[in-house]
């Protein structure tokens, strides 16, 4: 049933209620200022016709005009009602008016302003929308403007109205200056490049600016350079040249790009000569090869494009004489640029390090064939390079400069250059010494021998103030008198051109200054020997020995002793012995072998045999362990030759005690072999028995085979059994050592059957021992397998009528280890009586009787 109620006022529409509405109407009458009651009523009427719903909202807002909830729902519902209608429908105007009425009370609500502005944007009413945005910004506090501006800017960018957008952005940047990049991008897109460049320049100069896009100051600067250099006709308000040159001093690691940008600006502006000047300035100022390559390639490309453009213009308009001259000029300019590249690149490297000697030499080579440029380059080099900062050897510049004059026949100029070089305060004495040597070689090349000697004597003369060679506080001119390089050259010249006394004086002076080397000492002694001053030469050796210690004195001693023996032989034997003892006193083991052999040779040839043997004996103790084996071999050989092989027994015993197991084993075999040759079988067997203790049967099978062959030849069944017993004993000893080592390794790394980490937490202690026992049992089983099986005593039943063959078979089964000797040996043993011993007569080797060497 529908209840119709008329309102007495004519402007108010009739209110129509349904029976379901009465409870809500009654509640509203009781609480007409309750928002919740009205919202419940509105929620209930959501399915009602739109006019009825709007009427209900209007009734509620008339009583509660300041309710944000009611206005928000009402406006949202009104916008939804016209969403699918044409924007020219009058209903849109009603909704707009509804929003305007709402802002009478809700002008501080940014959400309503945003919805209204978006609604107007959808209608396409540009001016009305812009004014509404402005009203919203005026109505809202400044703290809420950040909610309006994103939509406002989107609205400005959505219409091709650059002036309106620019004005809006300018206002926005006052609120948010950090968003300047967004404005700059818009200006670029709208082709307002002049203002974009201005804004970008402002941003670059602002040190406090932080890019929202994460760009560095250099990236922004690079954008500015690209913008102003590529659009010279559109950017008029900025001084492009000053801006880019300011960047050259600011961003020194990107000079190549900035120079190219500046040249590109002038090229696009049509100022080609100015662009060429910029390129020339760039290639003369850049400091890195990368920047130079970048600028040079751009420069070459520019020249190529100019030539191509000129040729294209000439082909289109016809060639004239003036055009040909201009084209030839451009081609010549381009060729000159290409030919200058190595020199320009060298200039870049010298700007990086003007004290780089090698680069100066390369620069001279680039001027090959142009003497004036070479002289200028050398002059600039020697004036620029600081010897204390130089990379390389600075004296080579002076030497090469003088050599250039010499090659061109200007000897006086070359001498002047070298004379100036001798006055330069070099960092190292060796540099000045090299200059003096070059002075001498210059005179020698032109056969001015006296002048060469004069120069070197001048170089080695004592200065007014003496200084130590390595005293860096003194100039090198005061220290060059101790330079071995100059003295060596002077000594060579004196030997070739001077007298005996002058040469001797030079060598004596070298020794007095204590700057000699072992080779200098030997040369001096050889020089004296050539002139038959033998004792003087020996004194020279003595002076050299006093200057050096081991190992530097090794060559001097070897030469000295050799020369002394060859000179005197056995005539001054005691003096020779004293020299050897002096040489061996403090001699390192590494160098002792040669001296001992020389000493022993002296005693053998001129002295006593027992002295020689004593020297060999000392040598075996004095040399390095690695040389002891060789020394013992020599000792044994010489002892056998002098005294006979029987005298070598003590040497063998000592060698076996001293040498390592490997060499001792070899000595034992040789010792035993010698005893066999002498017929001392028991001695040889004792040696084999002793040596067996250091012979593991698993690795030294050759030794055991040798012993076995020995026993087969010279032994019997008992000795062979003893050998086998010893072998088993030794093998058991080595197996025990292996088992012990394996158990120790097992504690660290675990066994192959498992590890403690694999066990349960509660069983680690017990299973640790279990694993060790398993591993020990396994190793013991392997050792037992390696040993020959033991004889097992068995009880056999033998018939009384058993045949001889059956008894032999049972005996073989009862003792499988019984040694089967050959048939020949069995027959020999059967011929012998139990108490008989076979005696063999052997000849004594001639080596037993030694003697001294005959003269």
Curated annotation (Swiss-Prot):
GO BP terms: blastocyst development; cerebral cortex development; DNA-templated transcription; generation of catalytic spliceosome for first transesterification step; mRNA splicing, via spliceosome; transcription-coupled nucleotide-excision repair
A GO cellular component annotation in the UniProt record: U2-type catalytic step 2 spliceosome
Record's keyword annotation contains Aminoacyl-tRNA synthetase: no
Amino acid composition bias (Acidic residues), ranges on this chain: 820-834
Region (Disordered): 808-855
Residues modified to N6-acetyllysine: 420
Phosphoserine carried by residues: 851
Alphabetized InterPro entries for the sequence: HAT, HAT_Syf1-like_N, HAT_Syf1_central, HAT_Syf1_CNRKL1_C, Syf1-like, TPR-like_helical_dom_sf, TPR_rpt
One Pfam family cited in the UniProt record for this chain: HAT_Syf1_CNRKL1_C
Compartments, record wording: Nucleus
Keyword DNA repair: yes
Oligomer status and interactors: Associates with RNA polymerase II, the TCR-specific proteins CKN1/CSA and ERCC6/CSB, and XPA. Identified in the spliceosome C complex. Component of the XAB2 complex, a multimeric protein complex composed of XAB2, PRPF19, AQR, ZNF830, ISY1, and PPIE. Identified in a pentameric intron-binding (IB) complex composed of AQR, XAB2, ISY1, ZNF830 and PPIE that is incorporated into the spliceosome as a preassembled complex. The IB complex does not contain PRPF19.
Similarity field: Belongs to the crooked-neck family.
Known role: Involved in pre-mRNA splicing as component of the spliceosome. Involved in transcription-coupled repair (TCR), transcription and pre-mRNA splicing.
Protein name per Swiss-Prot or TrEMBL: Pre-mRNA-splicing factor SYF1
């Amino acid at each position: 049933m529908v209840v119709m109620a008329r309102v007495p006022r004519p402007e108010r529409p009739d209110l129509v209620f349904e029976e379901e509405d009465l409870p809500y109407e009654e509640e509203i009458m009781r609480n007409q200022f309750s928002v919740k009651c009205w919202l419940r009523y509105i929620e209930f009427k959501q399915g009602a016709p739109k006019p009825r719903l709007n009427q209900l909202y209007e009734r509620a807002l008339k009583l509660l005009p300041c309710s944000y909830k009611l206005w928000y729902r009402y406006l949202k519902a009104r916008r939804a009602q016209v969403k699918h209608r044409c924007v020219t429908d009058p209903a849109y105007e009603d909704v707009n008016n509804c929003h305007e009425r709402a802002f009478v009370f809700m002008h501080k609500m940014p959400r309503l302003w945003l919805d209204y502005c978006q609604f107007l944007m959808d209608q396409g009413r540009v001016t009305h929308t812009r004014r509404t945005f402005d009203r919203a910004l005026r109505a809202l506090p400044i703290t809420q403007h950040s909610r309006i501006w994103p939509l406002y800017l989107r609205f400005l960018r959505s219409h091709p109205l650059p002036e309106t957008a620019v004005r809006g952005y300018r206002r926005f940047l006052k609120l948010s200056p950090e968003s300047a990049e967004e404005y700059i991008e818009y200006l670029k897109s709208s082709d307002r490049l002049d203002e974009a460049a201005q804004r970008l320049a402002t941003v670059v100069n602002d040190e406090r600016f932080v890019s929202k896009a994460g760009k560095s100051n250099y990236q922004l600067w690079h954008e500015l350079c690209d913008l102003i250099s590529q659009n010279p006709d559109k950017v008029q308000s900025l001084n492009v040249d000053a801006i880019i040159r300011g960047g050259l001093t600011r961003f020194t690691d990107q000079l190549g790009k900035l120079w190219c940008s500046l040249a590109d600006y002038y090229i696009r502006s049509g100022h080609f000569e100015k662009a060429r000047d910029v390129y020339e300035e760039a290639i003369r100022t850049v400091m890195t090869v990368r920047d130079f390559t970048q600028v040079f390639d751009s420069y070459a490309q520019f020249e190529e494009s100019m030539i191509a453009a000129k040729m294209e213009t000439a082909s289109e308009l016809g060639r004239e004489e003036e055009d040909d001259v201009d084209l030839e000029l451009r081609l010549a300019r381009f060729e000159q640029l290409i030919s200058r590249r190595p020199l320009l690149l060298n200039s870049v490297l010298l700007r990086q390090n003007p004290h780089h000697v090698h680069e100066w030499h390369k620069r001279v080579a680039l001027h090959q064939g142009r003497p004036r440029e070479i002289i200028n380059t050398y002059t600039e080099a020697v004036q620029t390079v600081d010897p204390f900062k130089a990379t390389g050897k600075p004296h080579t510049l002076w030497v090469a400069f003088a050599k250039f004059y010499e090659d061109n026949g200007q000897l006086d100029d070359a001498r002047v250059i070298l004379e100036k070089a001798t006055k330069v305060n070099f960092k190292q004495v060796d540099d000045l010494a090299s200059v003096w040597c070059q002075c001498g070689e210059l005179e020698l090349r032109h056969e001015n021998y006296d002048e060469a000697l004069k120069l070197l004597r001048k170089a080695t003369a004592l200065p007014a103030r003496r200084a130590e060679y390595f005293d860096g506080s003194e100039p090198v001119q005061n220290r060059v008198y101790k330079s071995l390089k100059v003295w060596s050259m002077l000594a060579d010249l004196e030997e070739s051109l001077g007298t005996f006394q002058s040469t001797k004086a030079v060598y004596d002076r070298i020794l007095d200054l204590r700057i000699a080397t072992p080779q200098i000492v030997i040369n001096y002694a050889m020089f004296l020997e050539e002139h038959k001053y033998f004792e003087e030469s020996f004194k020279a050796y003595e002076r050299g020995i006093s200057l050096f210690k081991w190992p530097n004195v090794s060559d001097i001693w070897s030469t000295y002793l050799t020369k002394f023996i060859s000179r005197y032989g056995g005539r001054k034997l005691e003096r020779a012995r004293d020299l050897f003892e002096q040489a061996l006193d403090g001699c390192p083991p590494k160098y002792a072998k040669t001296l001992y052999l020389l000493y022993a040779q002296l005693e053998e040839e001129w002295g006593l045999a027992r002295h020689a043997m004593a020297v060999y004996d000392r040598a075996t103790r004095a040399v390095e362990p690695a040389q002891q084996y060789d020394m013992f071999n020599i000792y044994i050989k010489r002892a056998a030759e002098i005294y006979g092989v029987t005298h070598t027994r003590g040497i063998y015993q000592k060698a076996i005690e001293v040498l390592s197991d490997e060499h001792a084993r070899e000595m034992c075999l040789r010792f035993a072999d010698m005893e066999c040759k002498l017929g001392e079988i028991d001695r040889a067997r004792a040696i084999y028995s002793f040596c067996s203790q250091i012979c593991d049967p698993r690795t030294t099978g050759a030794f055991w085979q040798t012993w076995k062959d020995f026993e087969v030849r010279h032994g019997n069944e008992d000795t062979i059994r003893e050998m086998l017993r010893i072998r088993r004993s030794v093998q058991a000893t080595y197996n025990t050592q292996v088992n012990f080592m394996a158990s120790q390794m097992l504690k660290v790394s675990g066994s192959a059957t498992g590890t403690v980490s694999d066990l349960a937490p509660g069983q680690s202690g017990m299973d640790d021992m279990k694993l060790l026992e398993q591993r020990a049992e396994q190793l013991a089983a392997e050792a037992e397998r390696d040993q020959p099986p033991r004889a097992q005593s068995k009880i056999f039943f033998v018939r009384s009528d058993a045949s001889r063959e059956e008894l032999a078979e049972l005996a073989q089964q009862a003792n499988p280890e019984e040694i089967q000797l050959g048939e020949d040996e069995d027959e020999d043993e059967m011929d012998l009586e139990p108490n008989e011993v076979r005696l063999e007569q052997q000849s004594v080797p001639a080596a037993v009787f030694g003697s001294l060497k005959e003269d």
